[in-house]
Amino acid sequence: MATHTTQTAVGEREDLADVIYRIDPDETPIFSALKKETSNGIFTEWQVQELASASATNYVNEGANATFATPTATARFGNYHQISVKDVAVSGTLEAVDKAGRDREMAYQRVLKSLELRRDIEKSIGDTDVARDASDPRKSASLTCWMTNGSVGAGGSFATGDGTDTITGGTDRALTLALIEDGMQDAWEDGGSPKMLVASATNRANFSDLSATGNLVSNDVNMTAAKATTYVGSTSVYLTDFGTLDVAPSRFMGNDRIFLIDPDFASLCTLQGRNFAEKDIAATGDAEKMQLVTEWSLKVQAPKAHSVIYDLNGS
């Protein structure tokens, strides 16, 4: 008598896990580190005050008359808000059927689109786009449009630092600790104190490789603790002559740049009522529709407080 097996039987239920595993990354180190502010217009502006240069000859005669120098005026900066959206349309049938891993499809899509929108903003902040006004879809100037400290390769040049133009690339070169130290010194001399180094995966690994030369000492692991041997191949905190840097990898940055950011002098502004706002769109046919919209701008309160190391060969 033949044995009845699953190969010949009919009616077995599928074994589909009631969990959805998401592999795509959603970490956004720059977006997460920036302060969050609310704005009331499509063009957000701010002022930066610099002190007069220190003088070693500030001495006068007894009874001397007062002399009045022209005060140092503030510098006025501004950046446009850009509108970033994600749209979702879910059929009535899909919402009604029994689904694995989620109950309501629209609610699930809202979560996904929110994560995707954060990733888009992260990538835009680290890009090289200049500010654009209403003659085109408005665009917020990226970090490279504000930074004038750090270094570029031979033949390259920094932006003017007001958001209206961007960095000009030069000759590629390898990442070195000296480039990082110089960038930190530039920002420190102008009153900044970068606390965050953001790099692509390639440059993050290259930075850790620099520790293999013996120039860096890692204290990530408590060597006195009674535990299994741990081999340290990464440097996550770097103590420079001009401050301590937390090293953060970003999946949304190019291999040609590294940012040294002072989070005290940069923020993400969103227009009031437009911060990841969910808008239900009128149904057309048998579908539920929604738009997730945020109107945001990068606000770099003190451009000289940061540095960029550009024209890296990323190898």
Language-model features: locations:
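Flexible, glycine/threonine- and acidic-rich loop/arm segments that mediate assembly and lattice contacts
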Residues: 1-237, 241-315
